[in-house]
């Protein structure tokens, strides 16, 4: 029986929902639930209340300690209930929805003849990835802390609701190491000890995120799409996307969103989107 209701993060206006509505098959309702906190419980409770409905969830991958090569298909998401593995749904192969929106193939299809020259766009993406490599390594290291109430995995000014990013001059390796130190010091005042040494983790991930590292090779999977997008703002201006009044990066994203909204075959644009559509149709509990 195919999925009737697909829960996802965000709200009804979020770009996650708008993209998913273009991917899911007919008959599947996309239902945003806000924060990811309690996502598992929401799905299980909904199934108990509506036993005749097929309910599943799709969540962001976020940062994790798995640097395996991309598989271009959603990962299966399970919960352990009464000592049994129960399928909840899936999580994206890439970090978050922006990682898909800024992919060159999506940009080309969403913007059509208004798309920037793809070679120049790819150069802008590569440049952005190089600039945020250290910061990404720090965010991944902070995200690998597993105790309750882990530290916030970013810093800087709030660029849009929920997204913080430092000034460009604060992206150096030494800056990231210093910020991690401040976060560790703050947490040590609140807890007896950290369960992992975040700075050691940072050193390890730093190599993976640097040029030639496995995560850098696949930065559209492992780096934060929101960070990559924001760091491209000056390059996007050169490609014709002007501040008005939002930064050029958000103007660019809005053009992509509109292109997706006006297209009927969005689910065919990426192999992972095609596979998600299939998995929704084939889902079994």
Where in this protein do the model-derived segments appear?
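Acidic, divalent-metal-binding catalytic cores of TOPRIM
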Residues: 1-285
């Amino acid at each position: 029986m195919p999925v009737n209701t697909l829960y996802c993060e965000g709200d009804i206006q979020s770009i996650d929902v708008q993209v998913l509505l273009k991917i899911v098959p007919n008959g599947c309702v996309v239902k945003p639930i806000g924060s990811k906190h309690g996502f598992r419980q929401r799905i299980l409770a909904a199934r108990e209340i509506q036993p005749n409905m097929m309910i599943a969830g799709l969540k962001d991958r976020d940062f994790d300690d798995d640097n395996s090569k991309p598989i271009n298909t959603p990962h299966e998401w399970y919960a352990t209930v009464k000592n049994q593995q129960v399928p909840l749904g899936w999580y994206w192969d890439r970090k978050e929805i922006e990682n898909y929106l800024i992919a060159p193939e999506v940009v080309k299809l969403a913007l059509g003849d208004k798309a920037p020259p793809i070679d120049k766009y790819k150069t802008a993406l590569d440049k952005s990835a190089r600039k945020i490599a250290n910061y990404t390594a720090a965010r991944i290291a902070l995200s690998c802390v597993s105790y309750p109430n882990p530290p916030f995995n970013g810093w800087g000014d709030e660029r849009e609701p929920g997204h913080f990013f430092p000034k460009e001059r604060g992206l150096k390796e030494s800056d990231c190491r210093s910020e991690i130190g401040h976060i560790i010091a703050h947490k040590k005042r609140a807890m007896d000890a950290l369960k992992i040494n975040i700075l050691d983790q940072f050193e390890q991930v730093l190599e993976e995120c640097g040029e030639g590292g496995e995560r850098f090779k696949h930065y559209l999977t492992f780096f934060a799409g929101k960070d990559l997008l924001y760091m491209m703002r000056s390059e996007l201006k050169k490609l014709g996307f002007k501040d008005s009044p939002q930064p050029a990066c958000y103007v660019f994203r809005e053009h992509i969103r509109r292109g997706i909204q006006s297209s009927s075959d969005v689910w065919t644009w990426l192999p992972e989107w095609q596979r998600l559509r299939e998995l929704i149709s084939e889902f079994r509990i």
